[in-house]
Amino acid sequence: MLVLVVAVLAALVGNARTKHVAGSAVRGQVPGPPSVGECLLESPGVAVSGAFGGDPSSGYASTDGTGYPSLRLGSCSGRPFGEVAGVVTDGPDRRRSYQEAWGDPSSPESQCSDMVNAYLGTPEDSDVPPQWGPAPSSTLVLVGPSDLQRADGQHWLGCVAAGVDGTGMPTGYAGTVHGMMRTLRFPPELAQCLAVQPSTAGVTAVDCGQPHKAELLAISYADDSRPVQPDDAERSCVELARSMTGLAHPTAAGRIQVRVIAVPLPPDPNTRDTSTANPTQWYCTIEPKGDNVLTGPLLGVGDGPLPVR
């Protein structure tokens, strides 16, 4: 028996000897920069989301580009966290302070911001009041090459339009953010749901999955130099509600109502410019009638079930 065991072990050891194979190793292909329209497939996290996040006193990018996170990008499927709006060649190849990064219109960071605005379809400011700014939004996330890509000599900076929910947290979403500021067709996950209607105390955003009283659609600002007429605000808010919810009629057969709220702001004590007197924040909102509450977003609800209880 002992002789048999030793023989078997000897055979195994013999088979485990290293075999020499002719030829030379060939390095696999290193992925290049992302393409416009590719998707961010993981959450960017709180620390790296936001165009102006970070420590203003620190440099944004080191000489090897390690100042920006390398996040997983690829073909869009499921619920992405963002979309590549553009790529700046040799973006993170020099160290920049916060002021250098965002104070210079030609900096890679500022270029990224412009690319994201173009990708979202952000319109130019209108001279016709009220100038409504949609409440659903996206944030700029800057993405750098991976360690392997940097070793391959890549120094690009990816400009990602990332989704954020009403509380400002990164979120996955259905559909696309491409052109949403122009078409007013927003992923419902970007809705800004409110515990109560806006007031002088401000706006209290809540998770849209919990019962809430209202949903904020858009915001506008007015003062004596840019006055807003209540009738114009009401009419334009109703049109916004129709476009943003996808409802044929924004009252949904009397179950919900569009509501415009004007909240006076304190005057600026540091200016003598009388044209800025009577500053007012205007809110375009939508809410259920009576004592009912919303149990989900109305944003993009279309022909789906109305989230009213």
What residue spans do the PLM features occupy?
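Primary mode marks residue(s) on the alpha4-beta5-alpha5 output face of response regulator receiver
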Residues: R17-R309
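Hydrophobic membrane-insertion alpha-helices, especially the h-region
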Residues: M1-G14
